[in-house]
């Protein structure tokens, strides 16, 4: 899985940072998933190497404008391109009526299947939001001024490495039989033998896991959702010195994000959703927020627009 940050500012864009959007590229299935879609996100697509035509799912954290104002335009542009097989959207209860209102009142027609899924029940009852043979998505409620949700994306474990030498030594012919054995299936051979694929594969290889967490003040629910994740993307709107304001506005400080990462035991923390106040001229800079977080959780980096990297399971990464 590859993560690309398309917007890392909170509230309003700045010269260096657009508002919230994170893309998740799934190369093996030629799909792109999007987490939040602030104003101008489709412009950010044009400045990146991402292909909007691959967009398959959008996960919305909450309905504040800096997280959703870019969604109608992006969906409309995707429709004009004429090469979408459909998009599924996941988010708070008002998401569907918001989109319907904007698209209807702007006389915009979406020429592809568009389905909206409410996540409130799944979040409150610890149910699965999305699942297929490769990936599982869960979510949890956050603590914010409006209903907000964090999302966890997990790749399911894959079969262990196939012992080709053993298969050859036992005279098992190559071809479709090998593919079935690699999947851990039981296979009947032409000579009457029955072989079990599990005897030819090593231990299952765990998949990568990513958690997207914004907007919220420090939340035990977020800690639980992020437990053991390889990557935690967490908002850090304010510096530690402005913790009182963070509580008032129901946002996180850099140290709250780091505390979440430390308690959850994640592999890496990325700080995003920075207040535009930390611009040139302010004695407090984004690097100060980074240092505050690293004092609590050392493997922390600072997001910037178009930062992109691969996410791999810690046990498999070099």
From Swiss-Prot:
GO molecular function: 3'-tRNA processing endoribonuclease activity; zinc ion binding
Pfam families reported for this sequence: Lactamase_B_2
Active site residues of this protein: 66
Cofactor needs: Zn(2+)
EC number: 3.1.26.11
Keyword Translocase: no
Residues at which Zn(2+) 1 binds: 62, 64, 144, 215
InterPro entries (UniProt xref): Metallo-B-lactamas, RibonucZ/Hydroxyglut_hydro, RNase_Z/BN
Keywords recorded for this protein, A-Z: Endonuclease, Hydrolase, Metal-binding, Nuclease, tRNA processing, Zinc
Top-level enzyme category: hydrolase
CDD domains according to UniProt: RNaseZ_ZiPD-like_MBL-fold (cd07717)
Cofactor binding comment, as recorded: Binds 2 Zn(2+) ions.
Annotated Zn(2+) 2 binding sites: 66-67, 215, 273
Reaction(s) this enzyme catalyzes, per UniProt: Endonucleolytic cleavage of RNA, removing extra 3' nucleotides from tRNA precursor, generating 3' termini of tRNAs. A 3'-hydroxy group is left at the tRNA terminus and a 5'-phosphoryl group is left at the trailer molecule
Function field: Zinc phosphodiesterase, which displays some tRNA 3'-processing endonuclease activity. Probably involved in tRNA maturation, by removing a 3'-trailer from precursor tRNA.
Subunit structure: Homodimer.
Family: Belongs to the RNase Z family.
Name recorded for this polypeptide: Ribonuclease Z
Organism: Prochlorococcus marinus (strain MIT 9303)
